[in-house]
Amino acid sequence: MAIEVFSFFSGLGFMDLGFEEAGFDIAFVNEYNHSFIQAYQYARRNRPHRPQYGYYEGSIEEFLDDRVWNQRFPDYDVRNKDRIIGFIGGPPCPDFSTAGKNAGSTGKNGKLTEKYVKLIVKRQPDFFVLENVKGLYQTKKHKIFYEQMKKRLYRAGYSLFDSIENALEYGVPQFRDRLILVGFNRRRFGKNLRYTIGTNKTYEMDRIKMCNWPTVEPFQIGIVRNEPQDIIPELTVEYWFRHNNVENHANSRDYFNTVANNKFVSIAEGDTSKKSFKRLHRWRYSPTAAYGNNEVHLHPYQPRRISIAEALSIQSLPVWFEVLPTLSLSAKFKMVGNGVPYLLANGIAMELQGWIEEHMD
């Protein structure tokens, strides 16, 4: 039995893919940005499954209207013990990010988190997943808002579980903390529930930190550096570049051909200390893939920025995943950087799938 998932703020669909590969059925896709919808469909053009309720380009707020909702999903409330529906979504998060605008719940993007919560409360899915930046949980003024949202969800009948998860622990070659909030409808699953986020990790952070990761070495075009001892190769940029055959990927030439910049050759391999112009080290993991807002990541041993193919590998996407070629480079990098790392999403989905199967009526 495939569990139906309604995806909101879908973007390129990295999170959706993680759930699909865990056995969930993506039944509906909602995204506000036209280019994102196009790119979502393009990346899946060779996959046979199409969402049962299709794709919808528009605001999540529209689905708070009963007329719109019932017209789109006439059988949504027709439930039996074998039909389970969940919502997944990562509302745009720069208003809660310490590296972003920090406008909080009153910001344009910050308000979308509340709208997602309102939709969950009103439509009562059997479960939901909310993904966001850790700033929503750890920054004092944002956490007040976050706790208010949790109270609203609890009063609406949900048992809640949350955790800050790092993508590295799921096999992603990138240090990226994310807030994961999972809710189960008590009317469906009962009270006194127990659930632990993070049971499907590949590596523990303590082990990762104990590795002898290389730091900074002089940059030289095309220089060969052998794999160091006492690291986890599968968490390195170089491993994923090779794994995804990035030089022959469809998006391998998608990088900014800017006029020669001294920074392209002067910044050492592994120097990620600056706010912008961070050069990745081939035998280490990447910092958070936040492309945009003047955040520039440089190739470890080439005098250029990284390509879209390389960015996709750093987000742990499968080698077949491609970004629509007709989009602007800026749009492509924004899409890739905004996505939930695929292996992180898949790990969360796998443990959720197992829990639901164990707790079916």
What are these regions (language model features)?
Residues 1-5:
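Extreme N-terminal starter segment of soluble prokaryotic enzymes
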Residues 6-61:
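SAM cofactor-binding core of SAM-dependent methyltransferases
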Residues 43-62, 68-86:
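Short, structured active-site "lid" loops
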Residues 66-83, 93-274:
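Class I S-adenosyl-L-methionine
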Residues 89, 130, 291:
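Redox-cofactor binding/interface segments in oxidoreductases and associated redox assembly factors
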Residues 234-361:
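C-terminal target-recognition/interaction regions appended to catalytic cores
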